[in-house]
A protein has these predicted regions:
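An acidic/histidine-cluster motif and surrounding catalytic segment
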Residues: 1-105, 109-225
């Protein structure tokens, strides 16, 4: 299964972490490519040209998340979030174009083990991200037990999008859902639209959780250029 690492090559920190992740995946004999992400300021311009608006509902259902135009300081209404969404959206398109499952990585991941092939339905979490949403699954990384398989994931949306596998039919669902709208990428992938599962032998962990480093959308990576 092909892997794609979202990488912002004009930002040295992103380029370095992406290069390190690529080396880890190559050591595991996994096909991997660097994928140039969408910079935040570019995403803002693209959304204006496309008249792309905030999706009418989020992880808790219709009319729960307000339109960011009415709240300029809303967390989701930032160049970083928009650039991140576009980067993932373009890889959903790549998945459909290839017509095969792919793995999508953000660059700030440290891996523990290679991918162990299993069956899953739509979306499969492969790396631990948001601490509050993944703490109960920590043993899948540190002390996995039993036969590797897809396990239920009980949160409404992704715990960040630092590492996940995606099937073409699920990618198409997401593309159709957000063809002219957007949400933060992790909220966009939610169980109103796709089934989210987690690998019982998780591959890695985001640096935000391992070393206390900030995630991509909380740094200037996405909107610096």
């Amino acid at each position: 299964m092909k892997s794609f690492i979202i990488n912002l090559s004009k930002i040295s920190t992103s380029a370095n972490t992406a290069s390190n992740l690529k080396k880890q995946l190559e050591e595991f004999k996994m096909p991997v490519e660097l994928f140039e992400g969408t910079y935040g300021n570019d995403a803002v311009e693209m959304m204006e040209k496309e008249n792309r608006t905030w999706h009418p509902f989020g992880i808790k259902g219709p009319d729960v998340i307000p339109d960011p135009a009415a709240r300029p300081n809303l967390k989701g209404n930032t160049p970083g979030v928009k650039g991140c969404f576009y980067s993932h959206f373009r890889l959903w398109q790549k998945c459909v174009e290839l017509n095969e499952p792919i793995i999508i990585w953000e660059d700030d991941i440290v891996l523990t083990r290679p991918y162990i092939p299993i069956e899953w339905t739509d979306v499969l979490i492969l790396a631990l991200g948001h601490p509050a949403k993944t703490e109960k699954y920590r043993h899948y990384l540190e002390n996995p037990m039993g036969i590797p398989k897809a396990k239920p994931y009980f949160q409404s949306s992704m715990p960040g999008c630092c590492g996940y596998a995606l099937k073409p039919h699920a990618a198409k669902k997401l593309i159709d859902t957000y063809h002219n709208t957007f949400l933060p990428a992790d909220n966009a992938i939610n169980q109103h639209h796709v089934i989210i599962e987690i690998h019982s032998h998780v591959m890695g962990i985001a640096l935000i959780k391992k070393d206390g480093k900030k995630s991509l959308t909380r740094t200037s990576y996405w909107n610096k250029l």
